[in-house]
């Protein structure tokens, strides 16, 4: 969408400006070498690190995205074909988190320490905000899009907690979230192909007409809400531990707000399962269950 282009273009320009400035600060001459960029950034006075922080952070916050720079994502996901949506949600948004951990944290460490509580606040507020919006969605794609924003908010908060357990949890959760969100998009695509709609008000009874698809939907949904024994649990558990171990004096408050988002996540996810898998609706009378090859692919 045009909004996606504008957000990405502006963020890219901000990141480019920051990197050019850092390269010019290298005492050994202009260089974009990674170690030289780190040395140049870490040696800058605090006031210069402050504005460099926001240039780099906004660029990566758009990619993740987190509140309040998230508005491009639901529209882009809703209007994109499924293969593109999978690439956006499973791969591209993870580059935002990777950029924060690999670039932002070591390049401007003083500014990160100063602004970390602010970013964590935005992240945990975004978890609750996106979860509340997901609850009122009727379009499956938009619901999954807001779900992804909530999950990225938790990852962002853990990244700026900057503890060892949070970093290990980030690696695990980025991988597992990529798998889970891709599976969710595949299920949504199958529903739309078979019954011609993503509107949950017109869906229902899938457990009777497509039991295998229902099983796949339930398993992926449980992983999405990080139920114990699913792949989503261990990473999310480590993210919460990392947030709790943060040096911030507000770490308990952050934990409580993020925990509320997890509860809301269970609400919108289980509501989605209830409205699509059970009940009775005309749209689910036609169509068919997933094939063996499709089921193997989902597995």
Predicted regions located by residue number:
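Hydrophobic transmembrane alpha-helices and their helix-loop junctions in integral membrane proteins
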Residues: 1-275
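Cytoplasmic/organellar membrane-interface segments at the starts of transmembrane helices
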Residues: 80, 210-212, 269-299
């Amino acid at each position: 969408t045009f909004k996606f282009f504008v957000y990405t273009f502006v963020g890219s320009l901000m990141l480019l400006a920051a990197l050019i400035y850092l390269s010019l600060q290298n005492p050994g001459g202009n260089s974009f070498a990674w170690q030289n960029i780190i040395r140049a950034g870490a040696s800058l006075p605090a006031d210069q690190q402050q504005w460099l922080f926001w240039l780099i952070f906004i660029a990566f916050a758009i990619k993740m995205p987190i509140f309040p720079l998230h508005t491009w994502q639901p529209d882009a996901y809703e209007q994109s074909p499924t293969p593109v949506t999978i690439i956006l949600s499973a791969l591209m948004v993870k580059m935002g988190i990777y950029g924060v951990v690999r670039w932002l944290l070591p390049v401007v460490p003083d500014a990160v320490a100063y602004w970390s509580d602010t970013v964590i606040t935005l992240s945990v507020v975004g978890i609750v905000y996106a979860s509340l919006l997901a609850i009122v969605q009727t379009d499956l794609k938009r619901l999954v899009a807001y779900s992804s924003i909530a999950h990225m908010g938790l990852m962002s908060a853990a990244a700026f907690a900057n503890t060892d357990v949070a970093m290990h949890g980030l690696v695990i959760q980025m991988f597992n979230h990529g798998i889970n969100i891709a599976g969710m998009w595949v299920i949504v695509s199958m529903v739309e192909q078979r019954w011609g709609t993503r509107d949950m008000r017109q869906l229902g009874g899938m457990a009777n007409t497509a039991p295998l698809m229902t099983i796949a939907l339930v398993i992926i949904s449980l992983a999405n809400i990080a139920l114990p024994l699913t792949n989503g649990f261990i990473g999310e558990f480590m993210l919460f531990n990392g947030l709790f171990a943060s040096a911030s004096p507000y770490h308990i408050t952050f934990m409580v707000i993020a925990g509320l988002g997890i509860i809301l996540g269970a609400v919108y996810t289980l509501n989605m399962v209830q409205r699509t898998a059970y009940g009775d609706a005309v749209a689910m009378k036609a169509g068919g269950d997933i094939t063996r090859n499709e089921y193997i692919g989902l597995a």
